[in-house]
Amino acid sequence: MSVDIRPTPPAQDSARQNVTLQIVSVVMFTFIGYLTIGIPLAVLPGYVHDDLGYGSVLAGLVISLQYLATLLARPYAGRVIDGLGPKRAVLYGMAGSAASGLFMLLSVAIQGWPALSLASLLVGRLVLGAAESLVGSAAIGWGIGRVGAPHTAKVISWNGIASYGAIALGAPLGVLLVQWLGLWSMGASIVLLGALGFALAWPKLPAPLVHGERLPFHHVLGRVTPHGMGLALGAIGFGTIATFITLYYASRGWANAVLCLSAFGGCFIGARLLFANSINRLGGFRVAIICLGVESLGLLLLWSAPNPWVGLAGAALTGFGFSLVFPAFGVEAVNLVPASNRGAALGAYSLFVDLSLGITGPLVGFVANLFGFRSMFLFACLASLSGLALAIALHRRSRRPG
């Protein structure tokens, strides 16, 4: 007599919920970390441009410098995650976030000396960028360590929900804090959030270390470079919106630019929740092709927008399209290396979005100086279409035998 011991649907639902809860309990550190990034995001360009009196290129550089610091810190972050464990990396990252808030407080305190104030702000952005390199990848590694490699796409998706959700919440929150309390409140809130994240991470159980051969970082980087390039081209649209949407709206005489960041983040999260399993069903490259096509349409809307509401729709469509670009390319990239090099692979792959966001500020600022603010979104659209072409090429290559 045989007994059917397959899980019933309620048991399967319970197992899925347990996996999701385990993932959320770890990616909340990404949420906290990216909240410290989102709070100053909509305020700093105006602070540098209007209060300190510097130009749009330098205003963009202040935002982009954080991403450049993250890029440079990725190899170190990968070694920390694979060698010391994701928990240790999260603790280091939260401490760095708190330290960056102190530099921001100092910048506001010495605002009367613009050069010194800018220098303190730049140091704080560098520290925050290094902290981001630790927290984001470590949370993914911690989550995969808790629920297993088959759930990699789900962990990456939830980590993205946490990061962009935090930016969508943090941007308007930062504006409100400055309006109600003053510029000092940005730095103070970042210090408090970093301390909170450290306190929450300290008692949690670490994920087990995966033993095995550690590949040199440049070997890992070489394997994931094509996928990272697709991600980088898609990320230019997000970087353009995040850095310049406030100045773009001001140049058109439109109000409520911060709503574009919220619309981008809200649609980003909604798409990830609605289509969380699409990568497992369709494959990473197919999803990347669809998403980059949608993102390109959103950027075209922003470029051609006759009023702020069409611009808002363009930002929302861009967020919807960009939502699954990171996990779509990422799942394909992580599968190229052994599990013992997962942290290095995530760091190497994420490096490309840091590179993209790092150069977007000054590059797009230069484009805006030459051709006007509207031209930024046409430039970003062309970059997104280039990423789509690369995704098609990678998909075709992956289907070739051998």
UniProtKB/Swiss-Prot annotation:
Transmembrane segments: 23-43, 52-72, 90-110, 121-141, 158-178, 180-200, 228-248, 255-275, 282-302, 309-329, 351-371, 375-395
Membrane topology: Multi-pass membrane protein
Disulfide bonds: none
Keyword Transport found: yes
Record bears the keyword Cell inner membrane: yes
Compartment annotation: Cell inner membrane
Coiled coil segments of this chain: none
Keywords of the record: Cell inner membrane, Cell membrane, Membrane, Transmembrane, Transmembrane helix, Transport
GO MF: transmembrane transporter activity
Principal location class: membrane
InterPro entries attached to this UniProt entry: MFS, MFS_dom, MFS_trans_sf, MFS_Transporters, MFS_YhhS-like
GO cellular component terms attached to this protein's record: plasma membrane
Family, similarity comment: Belongs to the major facilitator superfamily. YhhS family.
PANTHER family, alphabetized: MAJOR FACILITATOR SUPERFAMILY MFS_1, RESISTANCE PROTEIN MDTM, PUTATIVE-RELATED-RELATED
HAMAP family noted in UniProt: MFS_YhhS
Name this polypeptide is given: Uncharacterized MFS-type transporter PA14_38730
Species: Pseudomonas aeruginosa (strain UCBPP-PA14)
